[in-house]
Amino acid sequence: MHPASESSHITRLAESIVANTAIVNAYLCEQNLPLPRFDDINAAVRPCTADDASAESARRAVVTASQELRDLLSGPSAPLMVDWTAHSCLRTIVHFRLAEAVSLVPANDIGTSFANIAAQTSLSETHVTRILRHAMTRHIFREPAPGFVAHTAASALLSRDSVTRDVVGLITDEMWPAGLKVPEALARWPNSQEPEETGFSMANAQGSEEQKKSMWSVYEEDAERARRFGVCMSVENSAMPFPLEELEWQGLVVDIGGGVGFNVFNLAEKHQNARFIVEDLSKTVQQGRLLLPKQLKDRVDFVEHDFFSPQPVKDADIYFFRRIFHDWSDKHAVEIIRSLIPALKPGARVRVNELLVPKPGELPREIEKMARNSDFAMLALLNGKERNNEEWQALFRAASDKFRFGFCKTTPPGLMAVIEFVWEP
């Protein structure tokens, strides 16, 4: 037996939690920022320490240590008992818009009755009560008086913020069903690299397997689902930024799959000596031309292009891909890279801005988990993948041995990176 006074791993975790919580608390008090409360219906979406690197590091340390301590003290069966009811309950709340049926009132108000909420939906009072009381066990809604519901920070966000509803809807309606079908997809199509042979395609199957469709094909036929997906991808990109403007951009830059051009607009404002071309499919290019600021029209242009087709812009200085390759398996990613080669001049640079998968244990578990989650999502949705530094280099070598690795630069906390390759024929 260990002496009671001996420091153990669990006590060290607890001490870390206390020490780092004190740092977070001191920062919030010094900045006159509100302390986190479950009943704060005006709580910000961003972490309370997001604007200070030291305080944010302490906050992450608290979260990581707390999760590890909880896992240790809960026993080995706890991680195996996945709480499927949480996903189902949350999907039901979003589907029936229950959060919006609860009034956004001050914390000392009695709230909205279960009966009143039910009257705003097609559900019975009994069902509403059971659903919301289930959510309350996870700090989503609260019951300040018997039979009455008030918002917590989480439910208030769900009520007032349409983007949050879109994100939750995408997770519960699209990603969760796709993830459930991953075992069947892997059994049906072992080692497939095709985007229409996935958990998503099985979850959305209609008719025979000959009618299998990729996520892109499904969204082409459903404007609302496509809209929601687009909103969520914008949120993901803003949540994992990279200071692209700090890199050198000069000469002619081609942003391949660049959407409506927002990344290029920002770069063009800061790099006055560079010219930019944004490439994407026809509808997206048309939208981008309408959004192009007048002051940039002499240096930014749009070109219709499918990145599997030969690159039409020849002899550019930089060809740029942002969050493109993770949607595609190695087979198709190599095809995209090879479509560039006929257009490349000696010394041309290919820059990739993507999530960089860390080595096991290289980053805090909370951060690594984000990368692993994204990688599994790519498997379930598209047979795509997130890649580490070595895999990026192997991918470009597979496309051609004339690509030389230039650099790999990351930004805290270490997930997002820019990887550059130079064409040396």
Swiss-Prot record:
Biological processes annotated in GO: methylation; secondary metabolite biosynthetic process
Induction text: Expression is up-regulated more than 10 fold in toxin producing cultures.
Top-level taxon: Eukaryota
Keywords annotated in UniProt: Methyltransferase, S-adenosyl-L-methionine, Transferase, Virulence
InterPro entries the record matches: COMT-like, O_MeTrfase_dom, SAM-dependent_MTases_sf, WH-like_DNA-bd_sf, WH_DNA-bd_sf
Catalytic activity, EC: 2.1.1.-
Residues engaged in binding S-adenosyl-L-methionine: G257, G258, D280, D306, F307, R322, R323
SUPFAM superfamilies, per the entry: S-adenosyl-L-methionine-dependent methyltransferases, Winged helix' DNA-binding domain
GO molecular function, one term: O-methyltransferase activity
Free-text function comment from the UniProt entry: O-methyltransferase; part of the gene clusters that mediate the biosynthesis of AM-toxins, host-selective toxins (HSTs) causing Alternaria blotch on apple, a worldwide distributed disease. AM-toxins are cyclic depsipeptides containing the 3 residues 2-hydroxy-isovaleric acid (2-HIV), dehydroalanine, L-alanine which are common for all 3 AM-toxins I to III. The fourth precursor is L-alpha-amino-methoxyphenyl-valeric acid (L-Amv) for AM-toxin I, L-alpha-amino-phenyl-valeric acid (L-Apv) for AM-toxin II, and L-alpha-amino-hydroxyphenyl-valeric acid (L-Ahv) for AM-toxin III.
Misc: Gene clusters encoding host-selective toxins (HSTs) are localized on conditionally dispensable chromosomes (CDCs), also called supernumerary chromosomes, where they are present in multiple copies. The CDCs are not essential for saprophytic growth but controls host-selective pathogenicity.
Assigned protein family: Belongs to the class I-like SAM-binding methyltransferase superfamily. Cation-independent O-methyltransferase family.
The protein's name in its UniProt record: O-methyltransferase AMT9
Species this protein is from: Alternaria alternata (Alternaria rot fungus)
